[in-house]
Amino acid sequence: MARGCLCCLKYMMFLFNLIFWLCGCGLLGVGIWLSVSQGNFATFSPSFPSLSAANLVIAIGTIVMVTGFLGCLGAIKENKCLLLSFFIILLIILLAELILLILFFVYMDKVNENAKQDLKDGLLLYNTENNVGLKNAWNIIQAEMHCCGVTDYTDWYPVLGENTVPDRCCMENSQDCGHNSTSLVWKTGCYEKVKMWFDDNKHVLGTIGMCILIIQILGMAFSMTLFQQIHRTGKKYDA
């Protein structure tokens, strides 16, 4: 009976982590594709030049892959050391997520202030050499989200000159449409537009967050249950 429970738990744990590992592979693939095909699109922040969408997806995909692999191997080999490592990694990730979430809400005003200032500093690099990625990133978000600048279109004046904004700020994009024509440009800043997008999609994002939390808790529960079941059977393993 005990052996049957062990086998059942083992294969449930293996299947769970196989899906987890495949998700990591998918994220890693998407991140590499973004890095290769969209390599000229970079971050908006001069303080964190490596914090691009591609690098972020690659990092998350790698963590998920490694964690899933540990879980798969620990389950199929019935190795307590690997199962414990899997549990500890998930616990660390969960605690880190909770700490970051708490800090974000506690210091939300400070985060908003620093983020806006950092983005404005990034605008100064818009037409400089070796910053084509930053320029492309701003052009895309302004065209796609119908916004201009960080807080509003006047953020571009110290960068491009009085009454001048990038052409992608224009409601109807055409060459040099942003020169001395502020009446036909998007007035809302991109920072506010992004906040509005998050607010409009908060239910979807909350659901995704809850699903991730449930998956992490299930993974920890499966690993500890299997760990205890292996321990009870009295099997011996090499650490």
Curated annotation (Swiss-Prot):
SUPFAM superfamilies found in the cross-reference section: Tetraspanin (SSF48652)
The protein, known as: Tetraspanin-9
Location in or out of the cell: Membrane
Stretches of the chain found on the membrane's Cytoplasmic side: 1-13, 77-85, 225-239
Domain of life of the native organism: Eukaryota
Residues in compartment: Extracellular: 35-55, 107-203
The family this protein is said to belong to: Belongs to the tetraspanin (TM4SF) family.
Key words of the record: Glycoprotein, Membrane, Transmembrane, Transmembrane helix
Residues spanning the membrane: 14-34, 56-76, 86-106, 204-224
Sugar-modified residues: N180
Species annotation: Xenopus tropicalis
Gene Ontology, cellular component aspect: membrane
Signal peptide (residue range): none
PANTHER family assigned: TETRASPANIN, TETRASPANIN-9
Record's bilayer topology term: Multi-pass membrane protein
InterPro entries: Tetraspanin/Peripherin (IPR018499), Tetraspanin_animals (IPR000301), Tetraspanin_CS (IPR018503), Tetraspanin_EC2_sf (IPR008952)
